[in-house]
Each structure stands twice: as structure tokens, then as C-alpha cells.
């Protein structure tokens, strides 16, 4: 830019608009012009930096693998810029050539089985620089319930449990499989009460519930041991020959000892 026919005095130049992709610098640049020097030429130089960029990276907190499909909001604290982005297959999203300033980045939604991070991050973007913002998320926890015979350790199939979140609204019921196992994955973080509700006819119901706390990224195991109802076999034989005798009738009744104190 050339300014002609200037008069003596202090001149200031202020940038009002920068080329596309560059930051405008509103800092005045001053020069004193002395016309007594004749046709002397004065040169003023202004430097512009490229607009900054922001790269957001989203990974699994335990494995470090990228998490695609995460939606994040970006809002300027020092200006009016606002937008949202979704991480790609590599778990990242890049905003190029956005205004310099201070931004707040918030996680809005995540794919299953991850838990949304409630932590905002603040980042300052400086002209000509690319700043990284890294979010790490944990998977929702899992719960394993095992049911075993207290005498033999063998699994017990067909036992139904009620699983209730103590500090939340989650509730479900499930029944042990042939391995005596129930597995619930991707359930909310929190404290749970597990109550035995129904057992096969030969198993004695356990009336004492168990409680467990599930934290993000972990699987907890709760084991119930139950006694199996006893069985009674009666054999009737000939006292001389030892041969079995059929059609004998017996009266079976439950009895107990009664203790009294003096």
C-alpha cells in the first residue's frame, strides 16, 4: 500500500481486514514523517499470522484406541464462534482456520459402550498455531453373577436374580445359564443390590442380598453359594435273605429337638 502527499507528523496505520486464512492485527503501527527531508520514503511493515487450528482427539482411557462417532461442541469464550464436530475413524476432528481466542470444548454424546465425560476443557488458540485437545473415556462397567453349590462348587442353572441400582433408576432381572452365570455389560456406574428371587425346586433360596459398586471401565463379580435340599432314600429288605421287599409303606415326618432352660 502506498500513501502519497503525506504531511509532516505522526501517522498510524491500523489493519481492519486480513486476507482469507489470516488473523487481522488491530495493533496500530506508527511512523513519524518529517517533510524537511525532501522526498524521503518511509516504510511500514505489518506481519500477519495464519488463523489457528484446533485438533480434538478422543481415545479409550484403558486401551488408547481411537473412538469414532463422538460429538463435541466448541464455543468461543472471547468471541461469537460456535460449532460442533464428530470424530472420524481415527478418533479425531480438526477445525482449521478459526478465530484466535479462548474456547470451551464439551463432549455432547459418545457411542456405546462409552460414558460421556462431564469435564469441559478450555483451550487458548494462538495465531499460526495448532492446539490439541484430548478426551479419554471409559466404557460402561459390567457385572458378573455366579451361582454355585456350597458343598461341591458346581454351578447351579436356573436361578433368577433382581439387580437394582441403589443410587439410580436402573433395574433388571436375569437367570443363570448352564454355567451358573449371568453377565450384564454396559450398565450404568453406581451401587447395586442383587437379590435372589427364584431357584429350582431342589435348591434352597438365599435370602441375603449382596451389594456391589461398579466403576467405569471395570467388571465386578458377585458369587452366591447355595445349599441343595437334602434327599432321603429308604431301602426295605428281607432280614434273612437281604432281598428287596416291595409295597412297604412308611410314614415320614419332620422332627426337631426342643431345648428348654431351667
Mark where each language-model region is.
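Short Pro-Gly-centered beta-turn/loop motif in secreted/extracellular proteins
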Residues: 2-12, 94-104, 183-193
